[in-house]
Every structure is written in structure tokens, then in C-alpha cells.
Amino acid sequence: MPDDNGKHPSIWRHRDFLLLWGGQTVSEMGSQVTVLALPLVAVVLLEASAFQVGLLSAAETSAYLLVALPAGAIADRVPKLRLMIWCNLALFLVIGSVPLAQAVGALTLAQLYAVALVSSVFSVFFSVAYQSYLPVLLDRNQLMDGNGKVAVSRSVAQIAGPSLGAGLVALIGAAGAMAADALSFALSAGSLTAIRTRERRRPSAEADRRPGLWAQIREGLAYVTRDPILRNSVAFNGTANFFVIMVETLGPVFLIRTLHLRPALVGLLLALGAVGGVAGGVAARYLARKVGSARISWISMTVLSLPGLLIPLAGHGWWVLLFGFGWISWTFASTVAGVSLTTYRQAACPPDMLGRVSAAARWITWGTLPLGGVVGGALATALGVQTTLWIAVAGGCCAGLWLFFSPLRGMRDIPLGKPEPAPVGGKP
């Protein structure tokens, strides 16, 4: 809330936001440890085949398509803070079951599949509730800053998490590293429990008029398609994800098989993407203030992302740095745009619809990831890896046209006024 002078206090002095942000950062770091440790548990302890490890990866990534839409509707029905706490406690138990089963000699691949799927389901519920709860804590004029800090912590976790995971695996084994991740969720739950801010309770008469679960899901999808800025931003994210997964999948193949780089150098080049995410999260608020929060969203993806076209030009020797520069530029631009677009969704959407609207947007945008992976693999087989990378980076840069040809192009700043009321009943 503004102070007596009409100014908004620094977000660094916002106790509840710092507790939320800190708890999420700890669990993000732990989750990145598990990204490395879970397949190692399967390979090292259970001698899983490549196909079985692929099934494990599919179980980890399928939850958004399976439960994102009902998760959003449920998040709008229950207290979001309480939902996040229970999700963290559930993740503590689910992830913690792996080192416990390994200690008593009862660990199986079936359990790992179940852990991967169930933990991803709880992660989806947490993520939807988290994004919906942030506007409860922060004033609308603080959302850009808050979302930028969340993006920074996510990118830092992507950089430091795998290194931390590798160190923990070397020190205490893969199962022990998962025990550390389980502990991170317990710490996050404790941090959230200390938050004092509570959501406004829905009046009982209003709650009685609330439509059923599937009607609410339809409302969320309808809201996304009805709002022209949301509609174009979802189309942008879905298109960008479709192409970026091609780069993430085929980039290592290109660097190892075409340029014959050592795996350590490949990992370093790919990690630069997270560095770009950190820089984008830090710079998002400054660029929004100087250029305009609406204007920077489309400028970042139509102008600042253009060095991404250097990725397929990478060659031997120092020319390999073109890959790193292109990748860091692309992730910087997409993070800046993402912070602005997330802030718009949080500010424009009615609070009691934010969960299902966020879930609907993510269901659409994340749903293009498996499709992009399949299409990228097919194109690489037919046309070659480098040619497919050209298609991917060109398509990723063109994704910004969804934002250019949207109402954002006629605005300097995203509107942060009072959102339109949510519809009551089963019709959008």
C-alpha cells in the first residue's frame, strides 16, 4: 500500500513478500537438484534403460496438460496461501520417500514414476496458486518489481541448482541429494506459514452462486480468449515455447556432434541461458520505467531477441561464442517480455479468477512444448540439425509479432487499473 506521501515503499521492506520469495527460491533450488538427481537414481541405483529414463521425464512434464485447468479452478476456490503450504508439505513427503525407500532396500522404478508424476502435479498446483497470490501481497504498481525478482530467483536456481546437485550427488549420493530437495520444501512451507497477509474471504451468498468446477474452467479459457492482450500474449508464449524447445533439444546435439565440443563446455554454453534470465529479471523494471512496460514487451521480442539468429552460425574455435551470445540475448529478451506480460495478467484479471486464468494460459503455452520437441526431432532427421536450428531461431524471433500486432503496440505502459468484474454463473 502507498505510504502517507503517496509513494509505494520498497519491496525489500515488504516482510510477507520476502518470506514468499525466499521460500519459493529455496524450493526452486531444491527442485533443480532433483532434476539432476532423479534420473541418476534411476540409472545408477536401478540400472534404468534410456527408454525408462525417457518415461521418467515424460511423467515429470505431463502434469500441466493433465491438471493445470482444474488446478486453476481449485486455486480460485480455496485459500491460496494454505494451498501452497499443503503442496510444499506434500512435496516434502513425496520426494522424501525416495531416500527412505532406498535406505530400506525397497526402491523401485514404479515408485520413481509415481514420485515424478505426483510431485509434478503438486508443483502445478503450487505454481498456479503462487502466481495468483502475488497480487494479494503486492500493490499493482509493485507487481513488475515482484515478478522481476521471482524471475531472477528462478534463473539463479537454474544456474546454481545443477552445480549444487552435482556436488550433493558426489558427496552423499543421488538419493541423498533428493533428501536435500525434500528438506527444501519443508523450509519453504515454514517460510509461507510465517506470512501474515490473508486473502479477502468470499461472502457466503456469493460463494453459493459460484458455478461448478468445469464451468469455472470454461470461464478461465473464455477470459483468456476474450481479452485481446491476453489472447495475443498466450499465442506469443505458445509460439515461442514451440520453437525454444527445439533449440534446447537440438542445441546440445549441434554442439557435440557438429562442433565436437566437450560436454563440460556444452553445459557452460547452455547455462548462459539462465544468465540471460537473471539479467532480464533484473533489468525488466528499469526498462519498463524508461521505455514503457507495454512497449518493452514487444520491443524485447522483435528487436532485443534478434541476436538469437547467431545461434546456428556458431563454429569452431572462438566462433562457438556466437551460440552463447545468441542464447543469452534470446533468454534476456523473453524474460523481460515475460515479466511485463505476467504483470498485465495479474493486474487485469479479477482476483477471484486469477487462478483459472493463469492455469488456462499455462495449459495452452506449455502444451506446445511436447509438440515442438517432436516436430524439431522430425525436422532434424529430414533436414539436418543446423537447418532446423535456423528454423527454430527464426520462428522464435517471429513469435514477437503476436505482441507487435496487439493493443500493446499502441500503449506506453500496461494498464494497472481496476480489473473488470468476474462473471457470476456458468457463462463467460
Predicted regions and their residues:
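Alpha-helical transmembrane-bundle signature of multi-pass membrane transport and export proteins
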Residues: 1-428
